[in-house]
């Protein structure tokens, strides 16, 4: 598994994870993507989901399983994950764009309307990403949830952004 060797998933490896929705479900609208492959004692995502779309099961070290049909894409589970392994992807944002929501703990935080570098799992720039929303509720313990729009072909690839420094 490339996660252990390189620190990030190969896109093909994601298909075997129980928290990744099918391509058919991705086409229906916003849905959670859980990129968790570590069997460690952890279950905040399960309790954060009011729809019961995420299940850990009897053993707290089980990988989270997604029932994508129950998921509304609300994103309450994103900041609940201490491993920052949960995202919400909407492949139907527009005809040509998808949105990606992800946890963000860097400063300075981007602002709505900013154009940032859309980064893949390896931290490489793959596209421009427009910041649509920045949410920082107190219950998220200072973890912001950022929503960006990206070209549709990068919806399942972009997992973070890099702010572009502006010359002032």
Can you name each region flagged by the protein language model?
Residues 124-138:
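Short beta-strand-centered aromatic/proline hotspots
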Residues 136-150:
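Short, solvent-exposed secondary-structure boundary/capping segments
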Residues 85, 120-125:
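Short, charged beta-turn/beta-strand-edge "cap" motif at the junction between a beta-strand
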Residues 160-168:
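Intrinsically disordered, low-complexity, charged/polar segments
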Residues 40-52, 69-84:
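Local cysteine-cluster metal-coordination motifs and their immediate loop/turn environment
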Residues 109-111:
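Short, well-ordered loop/turn sites that connect or cap secondary structure elements
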């Amino acid at each position: 598994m490339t996660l252990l060797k390189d620190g990030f998933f190969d896109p093909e490896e994601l298909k075997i994870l129980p928290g990744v929705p099918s391509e058919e479900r991705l086409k229906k609208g916003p849905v959670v993507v859980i990129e968790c492959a570590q069997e460690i004692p952890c279950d905040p995502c399960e309790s954060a989901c009011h729809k019961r779309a995420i299940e850990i099961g009897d053993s707290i070290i089980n990988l989270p399983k997604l029932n994508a049909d129950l998921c509304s894409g609300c994103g309450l589970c994103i900041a609940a994950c201490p491993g920052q392994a949960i995202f919400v992807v909407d492949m139907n944002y527009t005809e040509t764009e998808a949105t990606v929501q992800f946890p963000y703990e860097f400063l300075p935080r981007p602002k709505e309307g900013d154009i940032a570098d859309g980064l893949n799992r390896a931290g490489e720039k793959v596209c421009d990403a427009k910041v649509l929303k920045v949410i920082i509720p107190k219950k998220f313990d200072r973890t912001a949830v950022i929503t960006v729009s990206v070209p549709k072909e990068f919806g399942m690839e972009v997992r973070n952004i890099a702010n572009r420094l502006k010359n002032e």
